[in-house]
Amino acid sequence: MPRINFIFGIHNHQPLGNFGWVMEEAYEKAYRPFLEILEEYPNMKVAIHISGILVEWLEENKPDYIDLLKSLVRKGQVEIVVAGFYEPVLAAIPKEDRLEQIYLLKEWAKKIGYDAKGLWLTERVWQPELVKTLREAGIEYVVVDDYHFMSAGLSKDQLFWPYYTEDGGEVITVFPIDEKLRYLIPFRPVDKVISYLHSLASEDESKVAVFHDDGEKFGIWPMTYEWVYEKGWLREFFDRVSSDEAINIMLYSEYLQKFKPKGLVYLPIASYFEMSEWSLPAQQAKLFVEFVEKLKELNMFERYRVFVRGGIWKNFFYKYPEANYMHKRMLMLSRLLRDNPSARRFVLRAQCNDAYWHGVFGGIYLPHLRRAIWSNLIKAHSHLEPKNKILDVDFDGREEVFLENDNFIIVVKPHYGGSIFELSSKRRAVNYADVIARRWEHYHNLGESESDDNENQEGVSSIHEIGKRIPEDIRKELAYDRYRRGILQDHFFSANETLDRYRLAKYWELGDFIEGVYNYEVGNGLVLWRRGKVLNVTVDVKKSIEVREDGFSVRYTVLSEEDIEALFGIELNIAVHSIKESPEELIGKRIKVNDKYGVGEFEIVLNKKARIWKYPVKTLSQSEAGWDYIQQGVSYTIIYPINGRLDIELYFREL
């Protein structure tokens, strides 16, 4: 009789730095009940990948889960699939680090009784040159999306078999994940899943359908806990799929013992289809969505979808300069600390992918995820001898200046306003400058008219189908920055400028200093100077920065050739997250802040009274449950009138 082989897999992962209560909820609502129900169905088999971050948490907090997993491995119900231990995008890290990351998770798999030969490719980000690394790491097969194969020119009906792919003479097996199954499981009634699998049944004994997707879909995604567990979807699914004569449940390793891959293919750089939208710059992503919708209106999308391609994952380093800087700092430390065992774990942890990008989850917009990356980068950097240096760390063709002592790392971009873009405390392992800019995202417009695409369907919505509308109170506060956020950004305002216009990015910048190129000289500290124009009057700005044991000091001199009716503002964007601030205008010589659950306590001290504008820097980003309106940090702008010459001293001090 016609049959279909069916491989069912899940991928369990929590980002580095995620809140303990989130881990606990994911465990109680998804990871634990899934495994306990699997134990009830001895004929059901599952390929499971668990990221090393989650493994460490489970071993420390839920050892019973690990014991149950071992038991299921012994019984042959579970096959362990590995990846990089700390869930890096393998294509974005050096080969030496890829190998180390994979070996770490393979070693853990051996500890629980499984010699893993298969790899879950994080975010399914494929590059052909990965083949050599994977084979060197002892990997025999890798799991990617069917979209990768379609991008290589294969038709949908050719995607129910694994294939070989080759690079540099090394060969590996690649399994395609069926996208339709990703959207059916577990969101549609079991009947629909079974019907689809039956439709694939064939006399060809080697034909196989693969589902491998997030384990969080089974209980954590919105509305899924009730659907999957309380209403019995998972039990019904396991029962029916494991007892259906037309469906042959098997593991990847079992398939490869029985059948050979179909042939040889060459896959292009790719990820799953949604990633090609998310990774595009916002304006292009908007056009991409419009194009896809137009094809759907014309009933042409399914036919021509294979030729619809957007961006690649590494585009996020172009889209978000903050992600690029963080990533290039990681590459710098990976290179410098390759032979330092005590620093290596910090580097590997800092390669966790989640904080470097943004799609339907918060990603880079979640401060606690970035904070975890920075914490590990700073701990790794602390193993280097502190010294001042000049290098192009972020590969933009322009040099940055590093000022460093035993307690602080300061990185200045002379070519971008002579501003500080990293102010890292080694004692606290925090980067005070970790404030992401407010950017327009392409879905900010889409949200006005979208509704739940699944409202007339049986089952529950996937997070890709949940409609979102921006609340009006948030919409009226939305603002988009004209420049990256840093520390010591030099503004010139009209004398009658207001805080409200400033914070909503409606003000007029009179100078050309924010993104201007500063000359510089490095000695014990850093001296920067620039001559520019303010209201057609020549103005010179000079600032001398010194790193101190408890922070940094800066001396400003501002000289104008003529008297001008304008204000000079020094903006400091500080990564204050746990104190929910409101816009406020102050007068004084000192700002003292205690961000107890964030960067800690610090103060900004001035040599003379100033007007101070303070406001929270908030971004709007989509998430699995709707909208996140998040305080990324606080902008403190020190303002003085310009009267021919200004001499200002400012001290940032960690308390």
Curated annotation (Swiss-Prot):
Record-level Gene Ontology MF annotations = alpha-amylase activity; carbohydrate binding
- Give UniProt keywords alphabetically: Carbohydrate metabolism, Glycosidase, Hydrolase
Determine the domain of life of the protein's source.
Answer: Archaea
- Enzyme Commission number: 3.2.1.1
Q: What is this protein called?
A: Alpha-amylase
Family, according to the entry, reads as follows: Belongs to the glycosyl hydrolase 57 family.
Alphabetized InterPro entries for the sequence: A-amylase/a-glucTrfase_C, A-amylase/a-glucTrfase_central, Gal_mutarotase_sf_dom, GH-type_carb-bd, GH57_Enzymes, Glyco_hydro/deAcase_b/a-brl, Glyco_hydro_57/38_cen_sf, Glyco_hydro_57_N
Q: Does the keyword Hydrolase apply?
A: yes
GO BP annotations, alphabetical order: carbohydrate metabolic process
- Enumerate the catalysed reactions: Endohydrolysis of (1->4)-alpha-D-glucosidic linkages in polysaccharides containing three or more (1->4)-alpha-linked D-glucose units
Against PANTHER family, the record matches this protein to: ALPHA-AMYLASE-RELATED, ALPHA-AMYLASE-RELATED-RELATED
Q: Which residues form the active site?
A: E123, D214
Q: Which SUPFAM superfamilies match?
A: Families 57/38 glycoside transferase middle domain, Galactose mutarotase-like, Glycoside hydrolase/deacetylase
